[in-house]
Structure formats: C-alpha cells, structure tokens
Regions:
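Active-site helical microenvironments for divalent-metal-assisted chemistry
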Residues: 5-6, 10-248
Length: 248
C-alpha cells in the first residue's frame, strides 16, 4: 500500500472510521498475493471476488471490523499481526461452506474472547446469527485468574460445548485449530518442543491432549481436506508424546 500503510492493521481512530476503509481492488490483490507468497495462507477463496452481493458485503464488513478490533495485537512469540490468524481461519472456512454468515463469523471468531468488544457490540452490527456463532467460539477467560491455572477447565468446557454444537460452529473451530497448528508446525520445525514455553500451558502432554481431543470431537468433519491436514500436523508435532485420556 502507498506510504507503507496497512489498510487493515494501521488504522487511526479505527472505532469511528473502520466503515470508511475501502482499499482499491489492486491494493487488495497485492495484499492477498503477499499472504500466499509468504506461506501465511493458501489460495484466497473465490467468494471474495467483486460481485456486490449482500453476503460479500457482510464478509467485507467482518474483515474490517476484525482488523480494527485486533489492531496492535500480535501472535504469541512473534511479530506477525494477530489479524493474520482470523483471516486465515476465514479462508479455511470459505473452503468448507458457501454460507457467508459462517465465513464472516470465522473472521470475527476471536473478537469477543480477545478484544474489548462484546456480543452486544457485534449484535448491533452483524445480527443474531453471526454473533451467536462467534459467541459459540468464545471461552470464559475467568478474568482476574491466572490463565495457566484456568487453562484445563477452559479447554474442557470448550470441548464439551463443541461436541453438540451446530456443524457451522464445528467448521469454525476446525479452521481455527488448523490455523493455530500451521503456526505451531512452523515454529516446531525450528525450535522443537521448546515452542510451548511461550504458551499459557507449557506442558507438551496437555497440549497434545487438547489438540487430539479436538480431532476426536470433530471427527464428523473427517471428509474435509482441512481435517486431514489437521491429523497430519498432529502427527508431526506430537509424535511419541504420551497423552492423557481424551475427551470422549
């Protein structure tokens, strides 16, 4: 972009002005191409092509809102802007479904859990269905308690919830975890099991328990290429790790 500004990440006064953000198609294609070339994500989904539909506009609003909400945040242990993760999650979901509400919710999936914005904020802009999908992906962080101390109970609650969640919620969770594991694999190839030192849960066996339990509770999505990719990455990262009993 001109002057090295990121039209999604470097917004001034974003809460008031995010709706004014309209990069040109040429700028957008450059950004997408850079994501693909650097290996951050795969091919950008075809749904984002300019068609003027209400569904596309909803997705674009979700992208802009997520970028505004996550401004200034970075992925754990590196300098990658956090917005890369929800965008990658969104693109993975776009390969699973044509439902633009679900795709938009994927872009927003960490907003309630990790930013100042609430479900009521999202509901006013995106309506009930998208907000409910985002809320379904949001953990009770138990404010005021150390994250490491509450990690296990939060993950157990998350897994128990997703077992009976609608398939749309399960798709978002699968995409979220595929995106996380892709980043983990990249770090694992450089640092091995030391990668867990930057996380709230530093016990490799507990991390294996969670990621393998995710595979178990989402096994009804095994027909999706993303699920098979997830299994492949599980094997690489957690091969030989003794794992506690999985959530059934």
């Amino acid at each position: 972009y001109p002057d090295n500004d990121c039209r999604y990440f470097d917004l001034d006064d974003p809460k008031d002005h995010y709706e004014q953000l309209y990069p040109t198609p040429e700028m957008e294609m450059t950004r997408i191409h850079d994501f693909i070339e650097t290996g951050i994500t795969g091919e950008f989904p075809e749904f984002i092509e300019e068609d003027g539909s209400e569904g596309q506009l909803t997705v674009e609003r979700a992208i802009r809102f997520a970028a505004m909400a996550h401004k200034g945040a970075y992925r754990k242990g590196n300098h990658v802007p956090y917005i890369v993760h929800p965008i990658e999650t969104m693109m993975l979901v776009a390969k699973m479904t044509d439902d633009t509400d679900v795709i938009a919710a994927a872009a927003l999936h960490d907003v309630i859990e990790d930013t100042q914005y609430t479900a009521d904020d999202l509901r006013q802009i995106f309506g009930e269905r998208i907000t409910d999908l985002v809320a379904s992906e949001s953990e009770d962080k138990r404010a005021g308690q150390p994250k490491g101390d509450t990690w296990k109970i939060r993950k157990e609650e998350n897994l128990e919830h997703v077992k009976n969640a609608p398939v749309e919620s399960q798709m978002i969770m699968l995409a979220d975890k595929v995106s996380n594991l892709r980043a983990t694999v990249r770090d694992f190839r450089q640092s091995g099991s030391d990668i867990w030192d930057k996380f709230n849960m530093k016990d490799e066996a507990q991390q294996a328990w969670y990621y393998k339990s995710v595979a178990h509770v989402l096994k009804n999505l095994s027909y999706l290429p993303a699920y098979q990719e997830y299994l492949y990455m599980l094997e690489e990262v957690f091969e030989g790790v003794d794992t506690p009993p999985l959530i059934q």
